[in-house]
Amino acid sequence: MKTILLLLVRAYQLGISPFLGQNCRFYPSCSAYAFEAIGEYGALKGSFLATKRLCKCHPWHPGGVDPVPKKSSSKKTSSTTACGCGHS
């Protein structure tokens, strides 16, 4: 499913977007955001993030830089303490 969605986004970028011009008020563009979100988080969560982004893409939103959120690293190493500084 992830591959199909990525192909659909890429098809939009190559086949439709060039005829519409660069009108996106965000950086990265909504299609680039969708491609990255689906690639990073998979079909379900990536599509959810892309849909959230598309819902913000309207004339009354100021736009700006809106990157795909980074995955949080919930893995703790054995040398890390509760405060995170690594002391024993």
Swiss-Prot record:
The keyword Ribonucleoprotein does not apply. Its main location: membrane. Residues 64-88 are annotated as: Disordered. It is found in: Cell inner membrane. The keyword Cell membrane applies. It comes from the Bacteria. It is a peripheral membrane protein. InterPro entries: Membr_insert_effic_factor_YidD. It holds the Pfam family YidD. GO terms for cellular component: plasma membrane. Keywords: Cell inner membrane, Cell membrane, Membrane. Belongs to the UPF0161 family. Could be involved in insertion of integral membrane proteins into the membrane. NCBIfam families: membrane protein insertion efficiency factor YidD. This is Putative membrane protein insertion efficiency factor. It comes from Herminiimonas arsenicoxydans.
